[in-house]
Every structure is written in C-alpha cells, then in structure tokens.
C-alpha cells in the first residue's frame, strides 16, 4: 500500500481544511516545495497536491507553486483541483506531473472523463458527503451515490480512484474504512483512501484489508500525530 503525503494549496501556501471549508484553512508552510523535499527524505515515492483555489474557481490558480514543487524533487506527483478540460490536463502533464485527478468533471461529464482516461494518466477523485458525491470544491452535493459513480469508470483506463469522506476530512477522527472498501469493490479500481487519518493505526487498518491501494495523509502529519518516516517503514 502506498502512502501519499498531501499538500493542499491556497494562495501559494500549504494549508489544511476541516470538512473542506475554506474558512477553516490553517497555514502550515509558506514554502510548499520545501515540504515536498522533506516528504522525499522521509521515504515518499508519491505526492498528492490539490489546488484548493483552483477547485473553487475551476482554473489553475496555483500553477506556479505546483511547478516549483514538481521541480524540487524526484517524487511522482498527482495533482487535482479545477482540472476540467483537456488543455489543463496537458499543461500539467507537460510540466512533469505524473497524473491528474479529475473530480467535478467526472460527475458532470463522465464521457469526457472516460475519453481523457484513454489518452492520459487520469485518476478520478470521488468526494462524498453521507455517501453522495460533492463537487465544486465540495460546496455542492449531488444526488449521485459515490459507489454508482465509481462503477462508471471500472473499465475505461482510469489508473485509480481517490475516495474522500468529507465528514471525516481534516477532523483526525479516524478513516472510513467501510466507505473505501465499498468504492474498491464496486469499481474494481485501485482505490486510495482519503479523509480522517489520525495516526499510524488508521493506516495499518487500511493495509490490513489488502484491498486498498493507498492512503492520503495530511493533517495527522502536520499536527504531529504521525511520524511519516516510521509510517513508510511500517507500510513498506
């Protein structure tokens, strides 16, 4: 199982939110590229980067900061937040990003998402509140169930699906293992769990399922609850 340290960007700074609320943003670093270097030193292979401003605005607000992060390390980087057209996908991949995360557009235009997955390295991000998909920076909840959306991308070339339980995100209250398993089993895709990781036990619980491909870690590290170096050693 892969651990993905997370860097969420707001106005060029690394922040964490609680339940996806922008007004809850807490700044952890004004030099996100230095954070990326630290994660690489700890043993990370992948980095999960989200342009929060982009998620709300629908455009690449923190592109320059992401460029700096990509150039600072040899980490593989997956990027999400406001990526809703082919031009932006190509722009990020040309920059050196390993793969892009499509979120809102996956719900609004699954045909486009499937087409892009057939051409480029695409991950689908499914963010859910009480089991239903949320979009537009989590500000809008649809009437589509997360498991039903995941099924749509089972055989179209999507590399993985990231499933986030919004109610858990940034709350340090434990990860929703059952939700992650529902997505993994319904889609048959590599599934990356996100939201609520509080310590090493949450990571080990996901690993123990043998059905979850990865986990995204943010606030648990930033708040000193998780020794990432040790986590990489334990997960292997």
From Swiss-Prot:
Entry annotated with the keyword Isomerase: yes
**Which Gene3D superfamilies does the record match to this protein?**
Aldolase class I (3.20.20.70)
Alphabetically sorted, this entry's keywords are: Amino-acid biosynthesis, Cytoplasm, Histidine biosynthesis, Isomerase
Is this entry keyworded Cytoplasm? yes
Q: Where is the signal peptide?
A: none
In which domain of life is the source organism classified?
Answer: Bacteria
Per its UniProt record, what Pfam families does this chain match? Answer: His_biosynth
Molecular function as annotated in GO: 1-(5-phosphoribosyl)-5-[(5-phosphoribosylamino)methylideneamino]imidazole-4-carboxamide isomerase activity
Q: Name one GO cellular component term.
A: cytoplasm
CDD domains recorded: HisA (cd04732)
Give the pathway listed in the UniProt entry for this protein: Amino-acid biosynthesis; L-histidine biosynthesis; L-histidine from 5-phospho-alpha-D-ribose 1-diphosphate: step 4/9
From the record, what ranges are coiled-coil? none
Subcellular location, principal: cytoplasm
Query: What Gene Ontology terms for biological process does this UniProt record contain?
Result: L-histidine biosynthetic process; L-tryptophan biosynthetic process
What enzyme category does the UniProt record give?
Answer: isomerase
Where does it localize?
Answer: Cytoplasm
| Reactions performed catalytically | 1-(5-phospho-beta-D-ribosyl)-5-[(5-phospho-beta-D-ribosylamino)methylideneamino]imidazole-4-carboxamide = 5-[(5-phospho-1-deoxy-D-ribulos-1-ylimino)methylamino]-1-(5-phospho-beta-D-ribosyl)imidazole-4-carboxamide
Q: Which family does it belong to?
A: Belongs to the HisA/HisF family.
For this entry, the protein name equals 1-(5-phosphoribosyl)-5-[(5-phosphoribosylamino)methylideneamino] imidazole-4-carboxamide isomerase
Q: Which gene encodes it?
A: hisA
């Amino acid at each position: 199982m892969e651990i993905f340290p997370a860097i969420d960007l707001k106005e060029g700074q690394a922040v964490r939110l609680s339940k996806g609320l922008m007004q809850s943003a807490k700044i952890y670093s004004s030099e996100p590229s230095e954070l990326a270097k630290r994660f690489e030193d700890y043993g990370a292979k992948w980095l999960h980067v989200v342009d929060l401003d982009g998620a709300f605005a629908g455009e690449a607000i923190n592109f320059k900061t992401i460029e700096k992060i990509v150039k600072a390390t040899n980490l593989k980087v997956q990027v999400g937040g406001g990526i809703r057209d082919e031009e932006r996908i190509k722009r990020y991949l040309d920059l050196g990003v390993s793969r892009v995360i499509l979120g809102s557009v996956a719900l609004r235009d699954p045909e486009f998402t499937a087409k892009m997955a057939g051409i480029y390295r695409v991950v689908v991000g499914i963010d859910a509140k009480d089991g239903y998909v949320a979009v537009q920076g989590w500000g809008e909840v649809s009437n589509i169930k997360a498991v039903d959306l995941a099924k749509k991308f089972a055989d179209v070339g999507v590399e993985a699906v990231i499933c986030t339980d919004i109610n858990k995100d940034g709350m340090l209250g434990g990860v929703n293992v059952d939700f992650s398993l529902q997505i993994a089993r319904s889609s048959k895709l590599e599934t990356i769990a996100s939201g609520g990781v509080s310590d090493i036990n949450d990571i080990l619980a996901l690993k123990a399922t043998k059905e979850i491909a990865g986990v995204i870690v943010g606030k648990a590290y930033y708040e000193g609850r998780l020794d990432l170096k040790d986590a990489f050693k334990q997960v292997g």
